[in-house]
């Protein structure tokens, strides 16, 4: 997998868990409606602190979360114990492409939330196919970026600091950029179709209706919220690319502060605690193992 500060044992996983959004039940319901198989076993690839794991686990009897970050898993395990789910959920500290500890054709569903861009896709899809039962479902999804509803020009600032190679975007490789900016991209779709069928792709982009396959009214993965610029700054600081930038530029001003100051001007918002309306660009894939 590509280098990421998430693998650092000192990564602020508790901060990550506190500021990252959860996933809507409407999305989970859509996934379960698509699923035709039994509901015994679930595997969550790149489970991190368990954001998706705990949303989907009620539908299954056995759950395995896999993540290469021991710091992330420590948070997931703590919450598992607090929820008294330690007999139902277990975690494996391994890359998403390494599913060798799971018995072939033993899993009903594999999910991955905001994670497969860290994986070798060809290897990942081969491994997922090998552990799924013949009627098994593979579902993965991403939220891409929050778009400021009343200030569409703020998206340019987001692209500048979050995606461009001049700033934090330089810590994303070309494959990751393709997945995140092109709703999966052609390479992903080609590799996926080699091993999976009945592929459904659902895209919602507030700023690009031509790319969207659904409207806001019928999207099952719709995130609308009010967020302050201070809250948004904490979200930025949860990014691995932010941590990497801060590590490599210790003598420079905090890139998150610079980012927020530009947004403050664009959004005409002197008070960083004033809520601003946002809407997320999202996409998700649903598919089944080929017979």
Swiss-Prot record:
Cell compartment(s), UniProt: Cytoplasm
Superkingdom, natural source: Eukaryota
One protein family per Pfam: Methyltransf_11
One cellular component (GO) term of this entry: cytoplasm
Conditions for induction: By cell wall perturbation.
E.C. number: 2.1.1.-
Keywords, sorted A to Z: Cytoplasm, Methyltransferase, S-adenosyl-L-methionine, Transferase
Gene3D superfamilies from the UniProt entry: Vaccinia Virus protein VP39 (3.40.50.150)
GO molecular function per UniProt: methyltransferase activity; mRNA binding; S-adenosylmethionine-dependent methyltransferase activity
GO biological process: one example: methylation
Enzymatic class: transferase
Predominant localisation class: cytoplasm
Reported function: Probable S-adenosylmethionine-dependent methyltransferase which mediates cantharidin resistance.
Record-stated family: Belongs to the methyltransferase superfamily.
PANTHER family in alphabetical order: METHYLTRANSF_11 DOMAIN-CONTAINING PROTEIN, METHYLTRANSFERASE TYPE 11 DOMAIN-CONTAINING PROTEIN
Additional remarks: Present with 4380 molecules/cell in log phase SD medium.
Name this polypeptide is given: Probable S-adenosylmethionine-dependent methyltransferase CRG1
Species of origin: Saccharomyces cerevisiae (strain ATCC 204508 / S288c)
Gene name as annotated: CRG1
